[in-house]
Amino acid sequence: MKIPFDRWLGWPTLLLLLLGLWLLGSSLRDQRTVEAVPYSVFEQYLRDGQLTDVQVGDQVISARFTSPHDGKATVVAELVEPAMAERMSHYGVSYRRVRESNWLSQLLSWMAGPLLLLGFWYFMSRRIDGQQGGAGFLGIGRSHAKVYMEKSTGVRFDDVAGVDEAKAELQEIVDFLRDPKAHGRLGARMPKGVLLMGPTGTGKTLLARAVAGEAGVPFFSISGSEFIEMFVGVGAARVRDLFEQARAAAPAIIFIDELDALGKARGMGALVGGHDEREQTLNQLLVELDGFDPSVGVVLLAATNRPEILDPALLRAGRFDRQVLVDRPDRSGRRAILRVHAAKVRLAPDWDLDQVAAITVGFAGADLANLVNEAALVATRRRADAVTLADFTIAIERIVAGIEKKHGLLGEDEKRLVAYHELGHALTALALPSTDRVQKVSIVPHGIGALGYTLQRPSEDRHLQRRTELIDRLTVLLGGRAAEELVFGEPSTGAADDLARATGMARDMVLRFGMDEGLGPVAYADAPASPLVGLPAMPTLSERASPATAERIDAAVQALLGHARQRATEILRDNREMLDRTAAALMAQETLDEEALLALTAGLRAAGRPAAIRQVA
């Protein structure tokens, strides 16, 4: 086994080196400034009055020259006559007796300087050690990759559910690592790199560890941000060291998590003409990938949720040969993931796997794992013997709407305002044909700043939405504000988030989807943000659009929002009596589930298809 230099050999070697330098320096200094003479010569110097400050020891006598003597400042002689001290007054020289130190005190005096330097060095190294992830100052260029030998990852493909397509793609990598010759008999070579792309929480890192667990090979895991440091050249050195370690342990897997921290396209975020440390590290990674020999048995796996910002040179064939999408699971995938995580908790007989999978549309693997754990915590708080379906329902509400604020009670006026606002959303959603189911309406404060909420969950996985469906969603978003204006005559600040979401959706319809009849099927937005990140972003108008076109776009957005607001107002006005009756029930009970809400809104007048939208001139 190779012993790290700075861990076992560095400090003893450094100590001996400093001690040797100190002793050598002391010896050279003594040779330059001290003159050793016989006792007779020393006594002659005394007679001539050339000495002062005589120090008489047990075996040695020393003194300082009154003036420099051939560059020497001190003279030393071996004491021959013990009675020499008695004749000092005869020569008119002051003297004093000294006790000569033993070898231990001399050694300690010699080592004082080196020990101080060593202590300072050790202190600074520990500071850097903590900041640089454990490598220390002497090992700052070493890779910080965590190594999981053979099957010690503890993860197999059976532990990863809901991503069957991704597992099928990665199974080939496992087969190549297990038996390269059998799978290369037709001339096929093992891919050099596999890029796992997908939203956060979908199991990319877990998949990479499962590949290593299935193949039974060493697994080198490191984050892309761990390559970049404050010292120039450290990142490139760590890339080289990582690949050298992997080649020495081949067959092996290198896994770089959050590759976008390292592989961002060159030129992004740097000064014009600049060449920062990150780009130098990326260049070294490209060189290592080019130098990969497939027969060595080293595979590079990487994960990112920002593939659109990666350098094109990194994604070309011959580097990352295969790109695998790890997306959010569908209903059957969610069922499989829930089955894996639910096996770790005690479930009640009313547990319904299919029902929980149906109401968790859009949940990623990490979200489902958190849901099962949250449901178990809910059951634990009420001291139950098993986790029930109701516990899962409460857990979903906590995840989606936030934690209930038991001490954030509203006054009667605010409670009435919030009740009408939330029912404005709920009734418009019930009246429109293509909106998501309303599962619950509550005026109990939840989360950060939410005084109430209307919980809607889709009943099935949807990948496309028609124009009429988007207009219905706009109508539901503005239903709360429309209810406030209808009942109280003016809006409140509670609709701020609804307005922001509705405006973003309307701009998407006009700028990205070409859903305005006047502007036609033209995309006016710049390239959108990554669809894998999952963060809503307001679309930005392309610089190619003229000022006149920008005015028409603003008018189209205003027309969409105005039409949705008018439509919501008409729905609520047509069902005003039902709105008042349901609001009274909501204020009394504070929460209405789907069954109670449907009972209170029986006979609700449904809205028809949206009429043609006219832009404001």
Curated annotation (Swiss-Prot):
Domain of life: Bacteria
Positions with a binding annotation for ATP: G198, P199, T200, G201, T202, G203, K204, T205
Record-linked SUPFAM superfamilies: FtsH protease domain-like (SSF140990), P-loop containing nucleoside triphosphate hydrolases (SSF52540)
EC category: hydrolase
Subcellular location: Cell inner membrane
Assigned GO CC terms: plasma membrane
GO molecular function terms listed in the Swiss-Prot or TrEMBL record: ATP binding; ATP hydrolysis activity; ATP-dependent peptidase activity; metalloendopeptidase activity; zinc ion binding
Function: Acts as a processive, ATP-dependent zinc metallopeptidase for both cytoplasmic and membrane proteins. Plays a role in the quality control of integral membrane proteins.
Protein name (record): ATP-dependent zinc metalloprotease FtsH
Phylogenetic classification of the source organism: Bacteria, Pseudomonadati, Pseudomonadota, Betaproteobacteria, Burkholderiales
